[in-house]
Amino acid sequence: MALKSVFDFSQIRAEFEQAGINTRFIPVIWKHVIQNPNCQWDEIPSLPSGAYVLLRSKFVPLTSTLHTADESSDGVTTKLLIKLQKGEFTEAVIMRYDSRLGKYNGEPRHGGLRSTLCISSQVGCKMGCKFCATGSMGFKTNLSSGEIVEQLVHASRLSSIRNVVFMGMGEPLNNYSALVEAIHVMTASPFYLSPRKITVSTVGIIHAINKLHMDLPNINLAVSLHAPVQDIRCQIMPAARAFPLDRLMDALHAYQKKSQQRIFIEYIMLDGVNDDEQLAHQLGKLLEAFQVVVNLIPFNPIGSLSDFRTSNDQKVTRFQKTLRDIYGIRTTIRKQMGQDISGACGQLVVNLPKRQSLGTCSDVLTDIEDLHI
């Protein structure tokens, strides 16, 4: 039987409890593995003798390996290709930003350089969004909570990660229990990520949204809306047929009432599909009763997998102006990052590139995570 990841919390907790070993040693083990990913269990000091026996027989420090790390030409994006225990591959992306750029309320921002990690929750995806390369893979498998956390472990060796966004491969809310457990690990010792620095993105899995705040309070929710009318959503997001827009908006209203937090609305800009001014007005009317931040995302090419084209800059700016000036909705335009390594939004699809050398970050960008929500 395959050995389990030490970061699969429910597994290691159950084994420790069954063996009568205090679970307070688990974060100690995690900290050592983060600092020494190739360690032997006997190298961890001060564990009970029974813990060493259990770890050797049931667990490995990491079940995955970092296969390649490809850096964008501008040095701000690194795409990680990670090989899983059963031979599948998944991807994660490190994006580097400077939170000091720009102003907030007319004042210079505080902060500095830091990195956001875009994490995958599945290999492939069931949702089949027409503008997303991952959907072309179909669904392969769910990641375990340990495999999700291990992406953070691998990335932390390359950059100091402060923010995590579940916007990589897969639909996070379709792997709900592993998602919840992984985030509980990330926000505890020794990672100590703030829940407010974690964003979960979904196409709109209504039954999961209904319980999300109870299981993961204080995280950020992002919804891939992409159209303000159901027929266009279904055209570009086939899975939307299972989640009617009116029911989705009801679920978001209930979520916001409970969480008292703004919601990110993701809206990919597709030329001639969802970018005209009438749709901007429809989106504004749909969202004006909510506290939201709309993030307009220029479409990133995915080669022969799609015939879509990105909206031109004038259309994107006009769309933003309509939402912001007429409906008072805070609207940002996502900066395109990592296109040259297929690490941008919608471009994640497993391939096996040649390894490229890692460099240092010289250019930095502002991030939607710096919006005060």
Where do the language-model regions lie?
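Auxiliary Fe-S-binding modules of radical SAM enzymes
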Residues: 1-90, 96-99, 103-107, 113, ...
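Short linear Ser/Thr-Pro motifs
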Residues: 72-73, 120-121, 201, 224, ...
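Short beta-strand motif preference
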Residues: 80, 92, 119, 221-223
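Residue-level structural signal for beta-strand termini and adjacent loop
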Residues: 94-95, 178
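Canonical Radical SAM [4Fe-4S] cluster-binding loop centered on the CxxxCxxC motif
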Residues: 98-103, 109-146, 159
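Glycine- and other small-residue-rich loops at beta-strand/loop junctions that grip anionic moieties
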Residues: 141, 198-201, 334
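Cys/His-clustered metal-coordination modules, chiefly Zn-binding fingers
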Residues: 150
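Conserved AdoMet/S-adenosylmethionine-binding subsite of the radical SAM
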Residues: 155-163, 168-326
